Structures are given as C-alpha cells and as structure tokens.
C-alpha cells in the first residue's frame, strides 16, 4: 500500500469513518461512489425570546429570560443497493442548547434518528419503508418530525408526485404509538391540497409542579421545574383531522393549514371538550422565492437566492401533534423570516415574531408563569448548511 493511501486510511479511522476512502482501485472506488451518498446538514442559531415561546434550553439562573444558542448537526448516509432498494441511516447530534451561564454538556450524545430500508415497486408506483424514519404531514404544521418513528410506511406515489396516498404505523421516541393517513392531490401545476388524519396513543401519568414545604417551586440542575407524578397511568390518545393547501401565484406562493384535535382527552390527560381554542390550530403564509423551508430548502438553492415569508399563526396548545420550531404552541401572532443563500450549501436567515399567549401556559423553563394575553417578541439569527 502506498504511503498516501496508508495516511488516508489512518485519518479516516481517526475520524470514525472509512466511507469513501480512496484505498481501492479506481474502478472499485467509482462503484462505491455510484451507490453511496453522504450529506451533512444542520443549523446554528442564536435566539432571544422574552416569553419562551421558542423551543430550546434557555437560561439556568432562574431569571425567566429566554435567550441563548441552539445547534444541531446531522450526517445522512444513503446506500442504493440497486434501483429498487435503498438503505438510509442518519446520525443526529441532538440539540446543543446552551443558555447564558450554562455550560454545554451535551449529556445525551449523538444517536441514529433514522435507520430504514426502502423498497420501490416502480411498476405499480408503490413504496415501502421499514425501520426508523419519520414524516412531514399536512403543510408541516400538524406533524413535522423526520426521525424517531419506528414502524412501517406504505405510499402510492412519492410526496412530489401529483397524487400521493400514504399510510404510516409506528412507535415514536418516548413511547407514543402513531397512525396516520394522508392524501395529497395536485389539481394543477400551481395548486395542491392535502387531507390528513393522525392518531397518537400513549400511557400517560399526570404530573404536578414540585414544591418545598413553604410552597416554593423546586428546580432541576438545568433550571427546569421539577414535577411529581400523581395518579395511575392511563392510555390516552390524540386524534387530528387536518386540511391544507398550497397555491403558487406569479412571484408569490400561498400556503395554509387547519387542524383540529378530535379527542375528548388528549395524550396528556387533558379534557378538551370545552377547549375549542386550544384544540384547533391554523396558519396562513405568503412567501417569495423557491422555498419557505429556510433551514433545509434554502441552503441548496443557487448562490444569491433570496426568500421572504410572512406568516400569521393561531396554534392551540393541543391543536397539533408535533411540529418544528417555527410554530409556537398556545400562541397567535405574526412571524417574519428573511433568508439568502450565501454559498453553495450555506444560507443565513433572520426571524422576528410577535406572539400573544392564547391561554395560561403554566411555568416556563425557570419558573416564569406565562399568562393569557402576554405578548412576546422573538428574534432569531440562524446559519443553515447542507453539504452533499
């Protein structure tokens, strides 16, 4: 073996991977690269949020202020066994949320939030997935978690096709069981609609904030409020119906979604019959540019691509199953986002949000009590990357 090849292999072993190392013949290396694909993506952001509607660990000095850094990195490995079979694994760093005066300990470490096999029956346009993956349903509000759901997914068509019908059954991280069905239909090149059903089930045990003998709240080492378990564990469900649409105009795209939790008691044991505002969620958004996905879609656009979005949201605390950090539970208000692709695979975006609490949200990370009607200003600056 040549000295350069030995050095390349040694470096790869020190880095924890041997994928793509050029220690074989040129023909063998080309064969591997044709089948193998690696992607590195992630976000580093700084947020300032006076009312903790943003998601991520904040200050741990019990001041109730919400500001700090948030970061995650993912490495996705795809191996095309042949034209019909694909193996995918994604390594997730977890979220490094370091607030002011808080050391970044990252106690959970990295983990695989995706690990699945996909088989495509191209003749019948059917696609089967077995393993750990996730999904984005509706227009990304009612369910948006692309990992940590282990089970089976069957779909007629792909999500980018004019017609796609998808069925999913699996167990989510944390013990929740999820069923979903979704039909997405394009009526023209500019218009598409979705009709979605999502059901989640879990064993839930009620909790109450922990207090000392004087009635003062007790906190964990990271500044979060301690909770005590009360009562027996019960099997609870969430059951969502959801409708959404996307319409492209000249230079502007409109997207909107409405969802409602049909359950009498949700997975947290909350009685929802008289909580119409808390069990429903909706948003409408107008954006310019090719995408409103600033974290994942914008980095892969041409350098110099600009995108701007204006969104009004009214999201009840129990009106969605799981969403990304661009939606805020129990809040209504305006969210503005501007982003630009600065390098190949690299973009930046800036967010301003003005949100009002729809209900009494209980205690925030540091014991701050959020009241109905409270307003919050949200500022976020993010660096997004996706390298292939």
State each model region's role.
Residues 1-33, 220, 388:
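Cleavable N-terminal export/targeting peptides
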Residues 96-97, 137-138, 173-175, 201-203, ...:
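A short local loop/turn or secondary-structure capping micro-motif enriched for an aromatic residue
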Residues 174-221, 225-241:
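Loop-centered beta-sheet repeat module
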């Amino acid at each position: 073996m040549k000295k350069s090849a030995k050095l390349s292999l040694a470096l790869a072993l020190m880095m924890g991977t041997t994928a793509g190392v050029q220690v074989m013949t040129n023909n063998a290396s080309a064969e591997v690269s044709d089948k193998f694909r690696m992607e590195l993506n992630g976000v580093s952001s700084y947020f300032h949020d006076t009312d903790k509607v943003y998601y991520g660990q904040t200050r741990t000095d019990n001041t109730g202020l919400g500001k700090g850094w948030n970061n995650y990195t993912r490495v996705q490995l795809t191996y095309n066994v042949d034209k019909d079979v694909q193996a995918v694994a994604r390594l997730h760093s977890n979220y490094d949320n370091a607030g002011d005066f808080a050391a970044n300990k990252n106690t959970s470490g990295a983990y695989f939030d995706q690990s699945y096999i996909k088989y495509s029956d191209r003749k019948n346009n059917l696609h089967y997935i077995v393993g750990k993956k996730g999904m984005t349903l509706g227009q990304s509000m009612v369910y948006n978690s692309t990992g940590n759901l282990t089970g089976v997914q069957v779909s007629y068509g792909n999500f980018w096709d004019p017609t796609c019908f998808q069925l999913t059954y699996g167990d989510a991280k944390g013990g929740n069981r999820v069923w979903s069905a979704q039909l997405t239909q394009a009526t023209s090149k500019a218009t598409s609609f979705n009709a979605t059903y999502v059901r989640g089930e879990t064993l839930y045990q009620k909790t109450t904030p922990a207090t000392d003998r004087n009635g003062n709240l007790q906190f964990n080492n990271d500044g979060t409020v301690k909770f005590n378990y009360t009562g027996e564990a019960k099997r609870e469900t969430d059951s969502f119906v959801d409708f959404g649409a996307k319409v492209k105009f000249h230079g502007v795209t409109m997207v909107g979604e409405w969802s409602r939790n049909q359950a009498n008691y949700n997975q947290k044991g909350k009685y929802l019959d008289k909580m119409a505002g808390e069990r429903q969620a909706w948003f409408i958004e107008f954006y310019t540019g090719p995408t409103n996905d600033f974290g994942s879609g914008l980095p892969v656009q041409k350098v110099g691509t600009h995108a701007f979005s204006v969104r009004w949201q009214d999201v009840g605390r129990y009106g969605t199953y799981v969403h990304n950090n661009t939606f805020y539970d129990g809040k209504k208000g305006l969210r503005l986002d501007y982003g630009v692709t600065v390098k190949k695979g690299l973009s930046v975006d800036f967010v301003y949000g003005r949100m009002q609490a729809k209900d009494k949200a209980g205690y925030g990370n540091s014991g701050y009590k959020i009241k109905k009607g409270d307003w919050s200003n949200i500022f976020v600056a993010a660096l997004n990357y996706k390298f292939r």
